[in-house]
Regions:
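C-terminal motif of bacterial Sec signal peptides marking the signal peptidase cleavage site
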Residues: 8-11
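N-terminal capping segment at the start of a domain
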Residues: 17-64, 75, 284-300
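Second-shell loop/turn segments in exported
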Residues: 27-35, 50-59, 86-89, 131-143, ...
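Extracytoplasmic/secreted proteins, especially bacterial periplasmic and envelope-associated proteins
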Residues: 40-50, 63, 67-74, 144-151, ...
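A non-catalytic alpha/beta surface segment that caps or lines the substrate-entry region
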Residues: 43-106
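Solvent-exposed loop/turn segments at secondary-structure junctions
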Residues: 54-56, 85-88, 106-107, 117-121, ...
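Active-site-adjacent substrate-binding region
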Residues: 93, 207, 214-321
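Acidic/histidine-rich catalytic neighborhood of metal-dependent amide-processing enzymes
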Residues: 133-233, 258
């Protein structure tokens, strides 16, 4: 993903889309609590990193993909692997694999939870220029969102919400061109899935939540521009739930920049979608210092940050009417 300039939305309600979700969580009463485990999510992050950088077309990518598919099948009987050859901006053919797990598929009201699982092949933000051609481990940028999603999958298997949930682990997000002017070089797997359903007869959910870079110990989740414009109600509800749960230090009541990320492809397909993503106003990149560097490793991942995101997310899902 890439970040654009910080855009202030304070008092600018006329910039938001009229799109809203059909089912929303209730924040007026007690917050629903399901026992989300930050330690369990952390173990999922660690397991992914144990394979090495999950760069498409590598053995680490293949082995981790098999692991993720097996984990989803532990928790859902409706899991589909969508394999596709995608052409990257530099002409490389990427052997991409999207994984979709459907929970309670008979429920008419459905939401999408997604995260990308691939890693960037180049650490082109590293302070050491000699490392720019090395791959990124992606503990935060990739594995953290997937780790939270897998823990949510475990909880969904044991606890039935009032809405159905589809989990998409999407591929080929991070093989994008930072030097050119090609924002459409990112999120290739999500773009493909959004216009090519993974099974015949599939009905897309009515709203989505993207998890990206949700594990750093010092994470700051600002209200991302495209998210607020697409679905201000869900953004406001999630940040209010986070505050009620005591996570207001991470879900900051402030607005961030416009991020080119997987949610933009979901929005383009006509589905309101928001991005829970770590943004830093004091950073030259707009993200945490480890973004797209060789230092995006497990030592920066915090179980408590993963828990803050997971607890907020499950409160939202299990509070939906």
């Amino acid at each position: 993903m890439i970040a654009s300039i910080i855009i202030s939305l304070t008092g600018c309600s006329n910039t938001k889309s009229s799109s809203t979700t059909d089912a929303t969580a209730d924040t007026s009463g007690p917050v629903p609590r399901v026992a989300f485990s930050g330690d369990s999510a952390y173990s999922y992050v660690e397991a992914q990193c144990s394979f090495g950088p999950r760069v498409p077309n590598t053995e680490a990518h293949r082995r981790c993909g098999d692991y993720l598919l097996a984990q989803l099948r532990r928790h859902s009987s409706a899991v589909t692997e969508q394999c596709v050859d995608l052409r990257a901006y530099d002409g490389t053919t990427l052997k991409a694999r999207n994984f979709v797990a459907e929970f309670y598929p008979d429920k008419p009201k459905r939401i999408l939870l997604l995260a990308h699982w691939d890693c960037r092949p180049w650490a082109d933000s590293d302070a050491n220029a000699s490392k720019h051609r090395q791959p990124v481990m992606g503990a935060n940028d990739g594995a953290s969102g997937v780790g939270v999603a897998l823990e949510v999958a475990r909880l969904l298997a044991a606890n039935e919400p009032t809405v159905g949930v589809d989990i998409l682990l999407t591929d080929a997000e991070d093989w994008g061109d930072r030097e050119g002017d090609s924002e459409d070089s990112w999120a290739l797997g999500t773009r493909y899935w959004a216009s090519n359903p993974h099974r015949e007869g599939y009905v897309y959910p009515t709203s989505g939540i993207l998890l990206d870079m949700v594990g750093d110990a010092n994470a700051q989740f600002l209200k991302e521009y495209f998210s607020y414009r697409s679905d201000a109600k869900t953004v406001s509800t999630l940040w209010a739930l986070a505050a009620q749960l005591g996570h207001g230090d991470r879900f900051v009541n402030d607005y961030g920049g416009a991020i080119t990320d997987d949610h933009v492809e979901i929005i383009a397909a006509g589905i309101p979608c928001i991005d829970i993503i770590d943004q830093r106003k004091d950073s030259p990149t707009g993200f945490c210092p480890q973004w797209h560097t060789t230092d995006d490793v497990m030592r920066h991942i915090s179980p408590s940050t993963l828990a803050a995101v997971g607890e907020t997310l499950t409160a939202y899902i299990f509070g939906m009417k």
